[in-house]
């Protein structure tokens, strides 16, 4: 599909992919999120959840996908070093490309407040790199963030923090703020009915496992270092 779009780019007036910029505001999408896919499938093949040394079993698959991005893009590969995250987003907003790699957190930058898209204009697709059971593959799903309480703080501060965290996920105001106003993924059993996220990307992510498809877990915590990621990038 991407290569067909490129072959007809002048006729269609748009490209397949937004620019895969290697500026620091953009490169995390590829040296972390896209790079997670070959790591995930390597772990799946080896039956592990972490390793002391990533073998790179599926690095060729990763390279093929990235080559698809940069050779079917809004710009020439030689221009990518200076392309930013804003450039990529704006290309998508201006209907210059069909595909834009990003996550559910990007929703509010694309819909509402004068943005050109409605919920019906957008969807999310798994990234298939030619490995595993693609017919039953879901979206890449995970988090790098956790709620923590400082165990060395005063007990009164610990209690107040825990009370606030409980309020956020149980009160009407807290739940509405998280799921509706901010559009966050809220993986708590208190977020049912009207408190389910209004973010359609979150709903799509939930739909895949409901249909029996397996999410691709985030394995970022096992990536050796930022230097390793920079080498990949």
What is each model feature region?
Residues 74, 113-181:
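Extracytoplasmic/periplasmic substrate-recognition and gating elements
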Residues 79-94:
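Short helix-initiation/N-cap motifs at beta->coil->alpha
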Residues 141, 190, 203-233:
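C-terminal capping/gating helix-and-loop segments adjacent to ligand/active sites or protein-protein/ligand interfaces
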Residues 85, 102-107, 143-145:
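Beta->alpha turn/N-cap motifs
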Residues 2-51, 97:
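Extracytoplasmic/periplasmic solute-binding protein
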Residues 98-102, 123:
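Paired acidic/hydrophobic, glycine-rich loop segments that form the ligand-binding mouth/hinge
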Residues 48-82:
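Glycine-centered hinge/linker elements that transmit conformational signals in sensory
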Residues 2-5, 88-92, 106, 161, ...:
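Short, hydrophobic alpha-helical packing/hinge segments within bilobed ligand-binding/sensory domains
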């Amino acid at each position: 599909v991407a290569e067909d779009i490129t072959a007809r780019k002048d006729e269609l007036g748009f490209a397949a992919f937004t620019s895969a910029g290697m500026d620091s505001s953009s490169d995390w999408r590829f040296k972390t999120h896209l790079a997670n896919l070959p790591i995930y499938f390597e772990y799946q093949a080896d039956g592990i959840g972490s390793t002391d040394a990533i073998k790179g079993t599926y690095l060729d698959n990763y390279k093929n996908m990235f080559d698809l991005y940069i050779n079917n893009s809004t710009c020439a590969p030689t221009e990518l070093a200076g392309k930013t995250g804003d450039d990529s987003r704006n290309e998508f907003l201006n209907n210059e490309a069909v595909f834009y790699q990003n996550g559910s957190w990007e929703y509010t930058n694309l819909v509402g407040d004068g943005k050109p898209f409605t919920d019906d204009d957008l969807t999310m697709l798994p990234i298939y790199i030619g490995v595993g059971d693609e017919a039953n593959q879901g979206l890449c799903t995970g988090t790098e963030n956790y709620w923590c309480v400082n165990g060395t703080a005063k007990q009164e501060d610990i209690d107040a923090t825990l009370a606030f965290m409980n309020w956020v996920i149980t009160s009407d105001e807290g739940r509405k703020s998280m799921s509706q106003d901010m559009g966050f993924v809220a993986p708590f059993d208190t977020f049912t009915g009207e408190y389910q996220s209004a973010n359609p990307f979150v709903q799509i992510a939930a739909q895949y496992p409901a249909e029996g498809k397996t999410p691709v877990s985030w394995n970022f915590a096992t990536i050796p270092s930022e230097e390793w990621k920079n080498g990949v990038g």
